[in-house]
C-alpha cells in the first residue's frame, strides 16, 4: 500500500550561466525524474529510510539523500510512503517511484538497478527485556519464534540458517513491536539501525553481540535508467567525502553503520 507523503516545501532551482551546462543539468533531471518531480520511496521506522525526531521532523538515509539529490537536479520532490521496503522495490520496478535507498541484494538487482554502495550496515538480532536468549547460539531451538519483515532480506536468508526455530513474518516494524507485546515473536532480525530504533521503544530490550551478515545500502532506480548511474555514483561519492553523509546519519540517529567499500 502506498501513501502519498506530500511534496517537499521547496522546489530547488539550479541557476547555471552556460546554456550547455543548463542543458546538461536538464538532461540529468530527465534521466532520474522523467515526470519532472523526483519520487522517492520511503517507509517509516528505520533510519535507513525515514524516522521522525523529537520535534516531529523527518530524517533518514533515503529521505535526506533524496532531498539532496532533488536539490542538485533542480526538481521538486515527492516522498511516497509505503509500509515496507519490499513494496518500494516493486514500485520502482513498476515505474511508480524513481528511487530509494535499500540493501543491494542480487535478488533485488534483478528488479532494479543500483548505484555504488552508500553505507555498509550490520545485521543483528533484538530480544525483549528478560529474554532467555542471551547469544546467537541460543536461537535455533524448538519453540523459538524469529520475527522478520515480510519480503525482507531476513525472511529470505534466515530459513537456511535456522533449522529448528520458526520464522514469523511481520507486516512492518511497527507491527513487530506489537507482536513482541503479544508474545508472538521471541526476537527480531534485521539491520542494526532498525533494531536500535526498535529498542528505543522497548524498555530493557537489547541487541545481541555480533552480527549475522551485512547489508550494502545503495540508491535503487528503475531498470532502463542505467545512463543515470554515473551521475548517482558521483553524487554518492560527493556525499561521502564532503561529510554530508555523516550529518545525515547523525540526524537520523543511524547506528550500526560502517563505511562502504567501492568497486
Regions found by a protein language model. Give the residues of each.
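Bacterial N-terminal signal peptides that target proteins for export
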Residues: 1-10
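Extracytoplasmic small-molecule ligand-binding "clamshell" domains
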Residues: 26-103, 169, 251
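Beta->alpha turn/N-cap motifs
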Residues: 41-46, 81-85, 95-107, 129, ...
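Periplasmic-binding protein-like
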Residues: 44, 119-130, 192, 196-237, ...
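Hydrophobic residues within well-ordered alpha-helices
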Residues: 69, 92-93, 139, 179-181, ...
Amino acid at each position: 500500500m502506498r501513501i502519498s507523503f506530500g511534496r517537499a516545501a521547496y522546489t530547488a532551482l539550479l541557476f547555471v550561466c552556460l546554456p550547455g551546462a543548463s542543458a546538461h543539468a536538464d538532461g540529468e533531471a530527465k534521466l532520474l525524474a522523467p515526470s519532472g518531480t523526483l519520487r522517492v520511496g520511503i517507509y517509516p521506522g528505520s533510519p535507513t529510510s525515514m524516522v521522525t525526531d523529537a520535534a516531529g521532523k523527518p530524517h533518514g538515509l533515503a529521505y535526506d539523500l533524496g532531498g539532496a539529490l532533488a536539490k542538485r537536479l533542480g526538481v521538486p520532490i515527492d516522498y511516497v510512503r509505503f509500509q515496507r521496503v519490499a513494496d518500494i522495490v516493486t514500485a520502482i520496478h513498476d515505474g511508480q517511484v524513481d528511487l530509494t535507498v535499500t540493501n543491494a541484494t542480487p535478488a533485488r538487482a534483478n528488479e532494479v538497478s543500483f548505484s555504488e554502495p552508500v553505507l555498509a550496515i550490520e545485521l543483528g538480532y533484538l530480544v525483549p527485556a528478560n529474554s532467555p536468549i542471551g547469544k546467537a547460539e541460543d536461537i535455533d531451538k524448538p519453540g523459538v519464534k524469529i520475527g522478520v519483515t515480510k519480503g525482507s532480506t531476513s525472511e529470505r536468508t534466515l530459513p537456511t540458517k535456522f533449522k529448528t526455530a520458526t520464522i514469523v513474518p511481520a507486516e512492518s516494524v511497527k507491527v513487530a513491536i506489537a507482536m513482541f507485546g503479544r508474545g508472538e515473536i521471541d526476537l527480531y532480525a534485521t539491520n542494526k539501525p532498525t533494531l536500535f530504533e526498535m529498542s528505543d521503544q522497548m524498555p530493557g530490550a537489547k541487541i545481541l553481540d555480533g552480527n549475522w551478515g551485512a547489508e550494502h545500502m545503495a540508491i535503487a532506480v528503475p531498470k532502463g535508467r542505467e545512463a543515470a548511474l554515473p551521475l548517482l555514483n558521483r553524487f554518492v561519492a560527493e556525499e561521502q567525502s564532503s561529510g554530508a553523509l555523516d550529518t545525515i546519519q547523525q540526524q537520523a540517529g543511524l547506528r550500526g553503520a560502517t563505511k562502504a567499500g567501492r568497486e
